[in-house]
């Protein structure tokens, strides 16, 4: 959206011709002002050249494209919640069927895709499907953009062919683990361990181990990371982002967060582990949308691969990685863009700063809930 917005516009135009659409919307989080600005500029230029609007290039084909800024709710990544938000309603998923292709925006059939998908369309049209299928694996074609963050030397946005292994991404592109420490896990849907380093990143391989590509986030963790705290952190994020419409997600994630918090504070019991597993299965099977259905993956995978760390908390009442303590949170001034998202999310008003200037966390007020860490789009929140 920031680097080549014209490719998205071209892809949506091609899709509009194929589907017979005359209206299009690009839904962007308000926290990405540069993307919004460049998309609007690109749309205006396309309209000036007669590539958007009425009677495009002298034909009867008309297509109007709009940029819609979202309020930042994570659940609006779900199709029906996204369309509800564009319509001016609260972003909440609905029961399916009907699906968006049958009854989407304003009850009309709606083609809904990620901007990454639309940007690939012009290249496929120009070079052919055989060219596109030659990249990636037999069943997962093309490339994928990932946000590589965490305890790795080189962080940032990367684009790799589907089927690239985690080892290649972390150690060749990412430069390995910071400070010469050992690799422990990487979060992709759920934490994947050292035994998964040579696993290709494609849809089938990830599905087999209970992970998923999702939004393309890769969070690398080193040997000092407490995996129980990781599970608690991601559950806290999901619970905060739950729209509250369905009981399994609204109440289930809250109960799981309470249990995980007890365990991290060395106040849990062995029965809590069984309860976590039962709740995980129930929420996954009964939640209304993908947010709730995937909410328990970090808990399920950490219980499977790092159960010894849960036992250290509940049996020995001592964690070798965090000793029951939570580290202090700080904002990296070099990464912070001053978007203000963390200030709005902080329940204790512990974050201050001017818009477009680095923000600061007041460690005296901070309760280390992780809300800022979960919402920061730039990965600027650090634990020390």
Locate each region found by the language model.
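Ferredoxin-type iron-sulfur electron-transfer modules in oxidoreductases and energy-metabolism complexes
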Residues: 1, 23-24, 28, 32, ...
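Histidine-anchored nucleotide/phosphate-binding helix
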Residues: 4-18
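C-terminal accessory/binding modules appended to enzymatic or scaffolding proteins
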Residues: 140-154, 160-162, 166, 320-367, ...
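Short amphipathic, charge-patterned alpha-helical segments
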Residues: 11-15, 161-178
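Short loop-to-beta-strand transition segments
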Residues: 24, 175-190
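Structured functional modules or segments
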Residues: 367, 371, 375, 379-384
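Hydrophobic alpha-helical positions that pack around
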Residues: 36-162
């Amino acid at each position: 959206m920031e680097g080549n917005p014209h490719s998205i516009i071209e892809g949506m135009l091609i899709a509009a011709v194929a589907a017979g659409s005359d209206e299009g919307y690009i839904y962007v989080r308000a926290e990405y002002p540069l993307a919004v600005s460049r998309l609007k500029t690109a749309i205006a230029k396309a309209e000036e050249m007669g590539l958007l609007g009425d009677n495009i290039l002298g034909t009867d084909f008309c297509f109007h494209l709009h940029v819609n800024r979202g309020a930042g709710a994570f659940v609006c990544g779900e199709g029906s919640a996204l369309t509800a938000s564009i319509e001016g309603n609260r972003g909440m998923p609905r029961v399916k069927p009907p699906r968006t292709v049958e009854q989407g925006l304003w009850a009309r059939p709606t083609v809904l895709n990620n901007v990454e998908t639309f940007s690939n369309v012009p290249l496929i049209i120009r070079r052919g499907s055989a060219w596109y299928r030659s990249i990636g694996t037999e069943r997962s074609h093309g490339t994928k953009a990932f946000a590589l963050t965490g305890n790795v030397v080189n962080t940032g946005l990367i684009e790799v062919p589907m089927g690239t292994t985690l080892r290649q991404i972390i150690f060749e592109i990412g430069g390995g683990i910071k400070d010469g420490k050992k690799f422990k896990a990487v979060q992709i849907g759920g934490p994947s361990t050292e035994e998964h380093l040579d696993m290709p990143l494609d849809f089938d391989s990830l599905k087999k181990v209970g992970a998923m590509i999702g939004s393309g986030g890769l969070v690398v963790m080193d040997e000092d990371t407490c995996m129980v705290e990781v599970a608690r952190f991601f559950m806290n994020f999901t619970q905060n982002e739950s729209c509250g419409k369905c009981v399994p997600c609204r109440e289930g994630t809250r109960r799981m967060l309470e249990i995980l918090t007890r365990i991290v504070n060395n106040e849990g019991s062995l029965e809590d582990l069984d309860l976590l597993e039962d709740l995980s299965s129930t929420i996954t099977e009964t939640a209304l949308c993908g947010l709730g259905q995937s909410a328990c993956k970090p808990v399920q995978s950490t219980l499977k691969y790092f159960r010894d760390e849960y036992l250290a908390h509940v049996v020995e009442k001592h964690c070798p990685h965090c000793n029951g303590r939570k580290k202090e949170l700080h904002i990296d001034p070099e990464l912070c863009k001053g978007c203000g998202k963390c200030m709005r999310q902080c329940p204790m008003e512990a974050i201050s700063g001017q818009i477009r200037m680095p923000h600061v966390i007041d460690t005296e007020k901070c309760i280390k809930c992780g809300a800022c860490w979960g919402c920061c789009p730039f990965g600027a929140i650090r634990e020390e």
